[in-house]
């Protein structure tokens, strides 16, 4: 039986598996994910899930039953340590997965800032569920938060934090927020909108 191994349990990895089944592939499909949750939608991380208005299971693409019905095997909390393309094996800490076809769908990782106290408990990167869960432990009204980055995600987080009663400052390296993706007029609109909500924006 032909075996497809998908490394990455995000949007691309999950939809690769779904598409294979939809197109009639009847071989074995294995997804390896280093996260502890079924593949999920990430946009709510900076919105409803951040505001604790959405349960984790509501963000999942599909239920666990769906993967079982479609015979898609998912290995969560699993990190690939090495891949042998000669023998077609992917090696984890305690297992080995052979494959006929290998799909890399690992997505992106946030750029870590070179700074002192980089492991501080009040420094967060927003990329996955566990990041937001860590933030939930620190978020309380009237605290001050500094967001580095005035892109769409930064603005979404700022809006959520204002709703939660925090004092928010955005630091943007460019001359204006959203500079890389919008016109000056649109940037000014969002600048004014968030400023009126109480967000301090420094470019």
Question: Where are the regions a protein language model picked out?
Answer:
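Residue-level detector of alpha-helix initiation sites
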Residues: 11, 36, 108-110, 130, ...
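A Rossmann-like FAD-binding core segment of flavoenzymes
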Residues: 26-28, 74-91, 97, 164-203
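Short, conserved glycine- and acidic-residue-centered signature motifs
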Residues: 125-128, 154, 183
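Beta1-alpha1 glycine-rich phosphate/pyrophosphate-binding loop at the start
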Residues: 2-73, 160-185
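Glycine/Thr-rich phosphate-binding loops of Rossmann-like dinucleotide-binding domains
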Residues: 112-113, 155-156, 179
């Amino acid at each position: 039986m032909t075996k497809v191994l998908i490394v990455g349990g995000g949007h691309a990895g999950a939809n690769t598996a779904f598409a294979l089944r939809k197109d009639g592939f009847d071989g074995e499909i294995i997804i390896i994910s280093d996260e502890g949750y079924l593949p999920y939608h990430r946009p709510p991380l900076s919105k409803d899930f951040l505001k604790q208005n959405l349960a984790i299971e509501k963000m999942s693409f599909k239920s666990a039953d769906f993967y079982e019905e479609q015979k898609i095997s998912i290995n969560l909390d699993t990190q690939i340590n090495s891949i042998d393309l000669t023998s077609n094996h992917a090696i984890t800490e305690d297992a080995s997965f052979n494959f006929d076809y290998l799909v890399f769908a690992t997505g992106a990782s946030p750029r870590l800032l070179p700074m002192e106290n980089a492991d501080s408990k009040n420094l967060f990167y927003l990329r996955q569920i566990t990041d937001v869960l860590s933030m939930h432990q620190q978020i309380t009204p009237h605290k001050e938060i500094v967001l580095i980055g005035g892109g769409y995600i930064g603005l979404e987080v700022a809006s959520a934090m204002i709703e939660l009663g925090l004092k928010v400052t955005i630091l943007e390296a460019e001359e204006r927020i959203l500079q890389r993706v919008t016109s000056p007029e649109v940037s000014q609109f969002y600048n004014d909108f968030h400023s009126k909500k109480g967000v301090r924006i420094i470019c």
